[in-house]
């Protein structure tokens, strides 16, 4: 058995984190040392003080995340738990523990993912079908390294973050084409040396059969990687009481005009497809590229306000599409022409007031947004008013979007500049 691993010592965290070696604490817990949490660098007592303080927290407290995050880096810890669970590692959490903190972590504890050789097949204690979510839920809360997760799952913010972050990683870093390419490269680098390995340490008279077994192990592991995510998604739904998985697609129009940030990731190419979970709120935000502005979301039956740059709600669907429409920035001066829309804004740039002209002589509703989609002002345009005066003296100098909702012809979008000083 050969293992290739990083040596996570003070020098490692100094090089990779820029941590001061005199400010680093490293703790380890291993069955080889009696299963006792021992100090490799520094002392172990501060960890137990942090764990005790965490144990006194109330998961129903709205400030639970912030209080817990002072002791344990929760975003880091969540990724650590997800890694252990996706790999289906059960030689843990009483074994194979490495924890550190430093001046760089704000003296918050971070866990390191190590020793996964007994996870999944061909030689692990579990396989692709193993329900690791259930395994974690059944753990003893007196074990510090899982107790943070067990208590965290009683808090809505932590629980929602864990579920959405797990979905994010399965839609990105844990995609089969990504993770299998890493394993394939390591296999290719090792394969050429295995003939000499078996010749010296194996059976030199039966090298072809040993090479066949070596390749077979590689193919089995690849198959495990390919099938794992589907099983994990099923386990998340069944164990955490979620209604269903949601097949989600993201798209931007026109191409290259922006991106869409979903939960904790921002895909680079569109259309983009992923799987999320009904039952937890998901944040989806349109992000315009330089030279563009967010215009609106395509109607998908879930978005209540298609002009708001951010959607934050549950994905109550089985299949859903989010398409963000962007416009190109061409904000000029003078009057914004009404054209066939029948509405116009002037002057542009504007000072303390701007005038909304109603050439249609129809009643309508206007809403004013900043370029991040935040609603700033709204009002009614009366049928008899050919001109509506809108006070914008409280707005900071910037570009703004006016939406006029015509009940018969639909929305009209106008943009204007609030000038810094027109005097």
Question: For each predicted feature, which ranges?
Answer:
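Extracellular modular ligand-binding repeats in secreted and cell-surface proteins
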Residues: 263-291, 316
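Conserved "repeat-terminator" motif of extracellular CCP/Sushi domains
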Residues: 244, 307-330
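A short, amphipathic beta-strand motif
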Residues: 246-254, 258-260, 324
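Surface-exposed interfaces of beta-sheet-rich extracellular modules
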Residues: 198, 202, 281-307
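Conserved ATP-binding subdomain of kinase catalytic cores across diverse folds
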Residues: 1-42
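Residue-level detector of functionally pivotal "anchor" positions at catalytic/ligand-binding pockets or at interdomain
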Residues: 238-247, 325-346, 420-423
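C-terminal outer-membrane/trafficking sorting elements
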Residues: 336-346, 350-423
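Middle-to-C-terminal accessory/interaction subdomains
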Residues: 1, 13, 45-249
């Amino acid at each position: 058995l050969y293992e290739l691993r990083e040596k996570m010592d003070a020098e490692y965290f100094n090089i990779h984190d820029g941590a001061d070696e005199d400010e680093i604490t490293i703790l380890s817990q291993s069955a080889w040392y009696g299963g006792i949490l021992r100090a490799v660098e520094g002392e172990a007592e501060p960890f137990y003080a942090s764990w005790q303080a965490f144990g006194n927290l109330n998961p129903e407290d709205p400030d639970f995340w912030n209080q817990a995050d002072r002791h344990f880096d929760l975003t880091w810890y969540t990724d650590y738990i997800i890694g252990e669970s996706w790999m289906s590692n059960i030689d843990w959490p009483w074994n194979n523990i490495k924890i550190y903190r430093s001046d760089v972590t704000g003296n918050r504890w971070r866990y390191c993912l190590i020793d996964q050789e007994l996870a999944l097949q061909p030689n692990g204690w579990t396989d692709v079908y193993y329900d690791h979510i259930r395994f974690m839920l059944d753990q003893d809360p007196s074990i510090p390294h899982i107790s943070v997760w067990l208590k965290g799952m009683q808090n809505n913010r932590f629980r929602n973050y864990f579920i959405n972050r797990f979905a994010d990683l399965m839609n990105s870093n844990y995609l089969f084409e990504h993770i299998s390419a890493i394993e394939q490269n390591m296999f290719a680098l090792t394969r050429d040396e295995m003939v000499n390995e078996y010749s010296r340490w194996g059976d030199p008279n039966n090298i072809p059969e040993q090479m066949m077994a070596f390749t077979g192990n590689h193919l089995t592991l690849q198959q495990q990687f390919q099938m794992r995510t589907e099983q994990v998604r099923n386990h998340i739904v069944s164990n955490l009481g979620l209604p269903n998985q949601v097949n989600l697609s993201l798209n931007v129009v026109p191409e290259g005009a922006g991106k869409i940030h979903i939960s904790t990731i921002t895909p680079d190419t569109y259309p983009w497809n992923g799987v999320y979970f009904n039952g937890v709120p998901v944040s989806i935000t349109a992000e315009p590229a330089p030279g563009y502005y967010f215009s609106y979301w395509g109607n998908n039956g879930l978005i209540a306000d298609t002009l708001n740059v951010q959607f934050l709600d549950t994905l109550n669907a089985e299949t859903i599409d989010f398409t963000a429409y962007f416009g190109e920035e061409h904000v000029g001066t003078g009057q914004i022409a009404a054209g066939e829309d029948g509405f116009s804004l002037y002057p542009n740039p504007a000072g303390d007031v701007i005038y909304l002209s109603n050439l249609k002589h129809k009643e309508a509703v206007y809403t004013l947004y900043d370029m991040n989609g935040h609603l700033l002002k709204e009002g009614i345009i009366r049928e008899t008013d050919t001109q509506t005066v809108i006070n914008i003296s409280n707005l900071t100098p910037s570009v703004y979007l006016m939406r006029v909702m015509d009940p018969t012809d639909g929305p009209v979008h106008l943009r204007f500049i609030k000038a810094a000083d027109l005097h």
